[in-house]
Amino acid sequence: MAVPKKKTSKSKRNQRHAVWKAKAATAAQRAMSIGKSVLSGRAQGFVYPVADDSED
């Protein structure tokens, strides 16, 4: 089984954690932006059914 030879330093651990947090923040920002565009009706890349009651 593979085991690390030395303990990872706090700075390396913090750097990796910061990268992970930055990626998560970017994904959250993108999701929020897409959600806002869908709710405001400005989204161009989504197709969803629209309830059309004029058929009666």
UniProtKB/Swiss-Prot annotation:
Organism: Synechococcus sp. (strain CC9311)
Molecular function terms, GO-annotated: structural constituent of ribosome
Single Gene Ontology BP annotation: translation
Gene3D superfamilies named in the record: Single helix bin
Name of the gene this protein is made from: rpmF
Sequence similarity: Belongs to the bacterial ribosomal protein bL32 family.
Highest taxon of source: Bacteria
InterPro entries xrefs: Ribosomal_bL32, Ribosomal_bL32_plant/cyanobact, Ribosomal_zn-bd
NCBIfam families xref list: rpmF_bact
Name of this protein: Large ribosomal subunit protein bL32
Any one GO cellular component localisation term in the record: large ribosomal subunit
Keyword annotations from UniProtKB, A to Z: Ribonucleoprotein, Ribosomal protein
Pfam families, sorted: Ribosomal_L32p
